[in-house]
Structures are given as structure tokens and as C-alpha cells.
Amino acid sequence: MKKVPLVIGGKTLSSRFFIGTGRYPNPVVQNETIKASGAEVLTFAIRRINLEHPDEDAILQHLEGRTFQYLPNTSGANNAEEAIRIARLARAAGLSDWIKVEISVSEKTLLPDPVETLKATEALAKEGFTVLPYTSDDPILCKKLEEVGAAAVMPGASPIGTGLGILNPYNLGVIVEEASVPIIVDAGLGSASDVAKAMELGADGVLMNTAVAKAKDPVKMALAMKQAIEAGLLSYEAGRIPMKRYATASSQLDHLLSSHSKG
């Protein structure tokens, strides 16, 4: 199966790597890492941005001269009302009409609140936002988010920043199978093999921050993740062989033995 070009909110993206802008050791490393990733979509917490003067913001000013699709997120919001307010502020400041809805109530797990996420997604979609909600790996919830207007859905592989990888590949596979909008795997991916697995399961892309920013060499890790996306996508398009319980010889042993005995 060949993936069609990735289109979200009417925008065609050449890169399937979405990358976060936080937690890098310094702005130089941040810039070089983003460059190595080839990412077009950058996400950042709105609460960390100077909304009065976004062009002078310490996070965004180092990205001058390059064109990105900004994906502000509502990290820090505890309910739908807060997320909606934050999204409106970001749009009013001219950042973007793309918004990553991120609502959690537990500082320990940072797991997304399903009810509040659904409410915020529906409300913001009605206001004309291009909404990409961060959610759990629940196939039913992911489908409901799509139905209320999500432009793409972003299920977590595991809790944010844990690096635990894909805890429930079955659910992720079902989410992809049932979706009519792009699925971007978000949170918990820790290595290039995690990324390749997500793409092999049929994901349309991945969003990463901690696994890259906190790596010993963020620039190299960004390149590794970029190549893993490409490898995983190629593997998905090529179609893996079915898994079986018992072995199958790659050579026709019966035919070879029969020919040898006749000789």
C-alpha cells in the first residue's frame, strides 16, 4: 500500500517529522537539530511564548529566515475552556490557526483528558482552527475526534517524555485502519526503532521532542529519526510478509533432493 502525500488542513507536507522546540541545551543546538530533522512543522507550548511580541520571542527568533508551519500547543491547560482560551490567544497573536490540543490533569503521567480533549477539539474546529488533538491510544476516542472535526489525530505511543516506545501496537494499528484523517504518533517514542515501528504500523508521521532534544547528540538523533521515518514508510509501502507459527524453507528442498537422487 502506498501512502498518499501528507495533507493536513489543506497544506501538503513533504516531511512526516513534526518536532518540538523545547528542552534543547542551547539555541544553536536547537537550530542545527531542527535543520537535520528536515521537519516543516514545529510545535511549542503557547505559555512559553511572548504573545505580545512573538517575532522577538527567545524561542522563535532563532528560526528567522526559514519557513515553518507552526503548531502551537495548549500544554498546561487542565480543561477544554483553558485550551480554547489559549488557542484563541495564539491565533490573535498571529502565530497560527493550527493548534495542538493538549489537556492533562495529572502532572505525574501527563495523560490526556479524553472528555475535555473532545470538547475542545469540537469547539475549536467550529471556530475554523486546524485542530490536531493529542490523545490516548483509544481507537474509539480517536474516531470520535475525527468526527468532531480534527484535521489529524495524534495518539500517544506512551506517556510524554518516558521513551517507553509503543506500548500498544494493536491499538495503534486499529486507529490507523479506521482513520480517514492523518494519524501522527505523538509522545513516548524514544529511539529510531520506535519510530520505524510506528511508520510500519501505518502512521502518517511522528512528533518528537524529548527523545531528540535530550539525546547525547540531538543533531545525530534527529537525523536518525528522519531516516527511521523514511525506512518505516518504505517498509509499510512494500508490505511485510505475514507472521506464521512455523518455518517455511526459502529453498525448495523437496525439489532439490529429488533432483539429486535421480542424478
From Swiss-Prot:
Q: Which SUPFAM superfamilies match?
A: ThiG-like
Record's keyword annotation contains Nucleotidyltransferase: no
Recorded GO CC terms: cytoplasm
- Keyword Transferase assigned to the entry: answer is yes
Q: Where is the active site?
A: K100
From the UniProt record, give the pathway where this protein acts: Cofactor biosynthesis; thiamine diphosphate biosynthesis
Principal localization reads cytoplasm
Q: Where in the cell is it found?
A: Cytoplasm
Disulfide bond positions: none
Write out the entry's keywords from A to Z: Cytoplasm, Schiff base, Thiamine biosynthesis, Transferase
EC number of the protein: 2.8.1.10
Q: Which regions span the lipid bilayer?
A: none
Catalyzed reactions per annotation: [ThiS sulfur-carrier protein]-C-terminal-Gly-aminoethanethioate + 2-iminoacetate + 1-deoxy-D-xylulose 5-phosphate = [ThiS sulfur-carrier protein]-C-terminal Gly-Gly + 2-[(2R,5Z)-2-carboxy-4-methylthiazol-5(2H)-ylidene]ethyl phosphate + 2 H2O + H(+)
The family database entries (CDD domains) matched by this protein are listed as: ThiG (cd04728)
Q: Which GO terms describe its biological process?
A: thiamine diphosphate biosynthetic process
InterPro entries the UniProt entry points to: Aldolase_TIM (IPR013785), Thiazole_synthase_ThiG (IPR033983), ThiG (IPR008867)
Q: Please report which protein family the annotation says this sequence is part of.
A: Belongs to the ThiG family.
- What subunit structure does UniProt give? Homotetramer. Forms heterodimers with either ThiH or ThiS.
**Which protein is depicted?**
Thiazole synthase
Which source organism does the UniProt entry give?
Shouchella clausii (strain KSM-K16)
